[in-house]
Each structure stands twice: as C-alpha cells, then as structure tokens.
Design a protein with these regions (language model features):
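Short, flexible active-site-adjacent loop segments at beta-strand->alpha-helix junctions, enriched
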Residues: 50, 73, 114-116, 138, ...
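Catalytic cores of NTP-dependent nucleotidyl/adenyl transfer enzymes across multiple folds
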Residues: 4-9, 13, 120-276
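Conserved catalytic core of two-metal-ion nucleotidyltransferases
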Residues: 82-122
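Active-site nucleotide-donor binding segment shared across nucleotidyl transfer reactions
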Residues: 31-65, 69-78, 143, 251-276
Length: 276
C-alpha cells in the first residue's frame, strides 16, 4: 500500500516541472518509458534525481532516468521495451540494465540492486513507494528510506553521495521510519552512524534528525563491535576502486564474495574490469 507524502521543501512538484524544465522530447521519452512499464503490468518506482527533487527540493535534470524494479521483473521489462522498438542492454548483470531512446541520446536505467549487491529491490521497496509526480505525470517514487539506504554506500573517488544523504536527513529526518531504516542497514548500521555523525558536523545549528534511541542503538553497536577474527576490508562495499589494493595486495578478504556477500570471484572480476 502506498502512503501519501507531504513535503515542505520550498520546491513542490509544480516547481519541478515548471522551472528548469528539460526539453519536451526528454520528458516525453520518460513518460513513454513509464507508460510501457505500466502497460506491461510491471511494478516500479522512480528514483534518482527526480525522486530526490521531490524529497529534498534539489532539482537536477539529467539525461538518464532511474527506474527501480525487482530483478524478477527485468526480463518482462526488457521485452516490453523491445516490443516498442527501443534498444535494451544489460549493462551489469548483477544490478542494472538500460533502455535507450530511438536516437540513442537518452536512456532509462532499470535498477534492481546496487553495485555492491547490498541494496536489492524487493517487495518492501516497491510497497513503500510514495505517490508523486515526475515532470507533470503521476508516478510512484522511491521512499526516502530506500534512497538514503542506497546512497549511503556510494563513496567513490569520483562520486560521493554523502551530500545527498545529509540533505535527505535535513529535509526528511523527522518523518523517516527509523525502525525500517535500521532494518534496511542491518549489519551495516555503522555506515548509517557515520552519516549521522557527518550530519552533526555539517549542520551544527540543526536538531538531530534521528530520535535518541537510534543514536543509543548505534553507539552501542559502535562500542560493542569486536575486532574481527577475519582480516576483512569492508571498504569495497563503499567503493569498488579505492580498496582494490587491500583485497588484491594486502591480504584482506573482500566481503562482496560469497558466502559473506552476494558475488562470485568471476562476477567481481567482470565488474571491476568493466568499471576500469
């Protein structure tokens, strides 16, 4: 069941599709992509820049359009786009595919997991989507909790989404379902804790976005975490590139590998080679 969302950010959906609006062919293609998915009966939620704009008021128009769906729905989604004459490509089999506009200039990202394999799109992700508008068209939007969860792990040299996380905490912190968010992070809750610490540094004049019990829980996690008996570097969950030396030369285990993670060695090698 979808829940209503009321956001006071100084930029509502009307502002989003009347100020800095992209070229008509851009949003026409995005509208068409959503029409195709809905006609095929595929559950999805819009994320990326357009969902972030609704949740925070930060407007960024990009040439890609992020649609989140379950991996089980991907074959039907690709087939639906191809029936409409759109070229598709499974960019990285473990988390993302694309559907391209006829001229190849625009594309839709079909996302069903995260690059690190942690943030998989599941029934809860789609059931928690909130009703909204994307460039004047009704559309389900990824909930703030899922956006924050997935963005918290993006800490590459060339892309760090910490500012997006801080802005989500600033604009949506009081309304977040913190129990659900903690459950999403699970054993990686210290990543959330690190962003809450950064928030306190970034916004010293703002109240804490999380209730005291959340800080108590995370502080206890921090204090009680024992030193791992296994020599492991969890940095690869934050950046595919910046911790390669740890797992390739310094003898640290890679937590992305099974059974600890979701990847085989071949999958990691393929992913790393493609990103390089």
């Amino acid at each position: 069941m979808q829940r209503e969302i009321h956001i006071s950010t100084g930029a509502d959906t009307h502002t989003l599709h009347s100020s800095g609006m992209p070229d008509p062919h851009v949003f026409q293609f995005y509208h068409r992509a959503m029409d195709i998915l809905e006609a095929a009966g595929i559950d999805y939620a819009v994320g990326g820049a357009y969902a972030l704009a609704v949740h925070t008021g930060i407007v960024r128009h990009t040439k890609d359009f992020d649609v989140f769906l379950k991996k089980e729905s991907l074959p039907d989604a690709l087939a639906a786009f191809e029936r409409e004459g759109l070229r598709t490509h499974v960019t990285h089999p473990h988390w993302i595919a694309k559907a391209f506009s006829p001229d190849g200039e625009l594309f839709v990202d079909l996302i069903y997991s995260s690059g690190n394999g942690i943030c998989r799109v599941d029934d809860e992700w789609l059931a928690s989507a909130v009703p909204g508008e994307v460039l004047g068209r009704p559309a389900p939007l990824c909930a703030a909790e899922e956006i924050l969860w997935s963005k918290s792990f993006i800490q590459e040299r060339e892309r760090f989404d910490g500012a997006d996380v801080a802005h989500l905490l600033l604009k949506r912190g009081e309304k977040l379902n913190w129990d659900r968010l903690l459950a999403r992070f699970g054993g990686n809750a210290l990543v959330l804790f690190s962003h809450l610490v950064l928030f306190r540094f970034i916004y010293p004049s703002e109240p804490s976005p999380a209730p005291p019990r959340v800080y108590d829980f995370l502080l206890e996690q921090f204090r009680s975490q024992p030193v791992s008996k296994e020599k492991v570097c969890r940095g690869t969950l934050l950046s595919w590139s910046q911790y390669l030396i740890d797992v390739e030369e310094w003898g640290y285990a890679d937590p992305r590998l099974r059974p600890r993670g979701n990847f085989t060695a071949d999958q990691i090698e393929t992913w790393t080679r493609a990103e390089k």
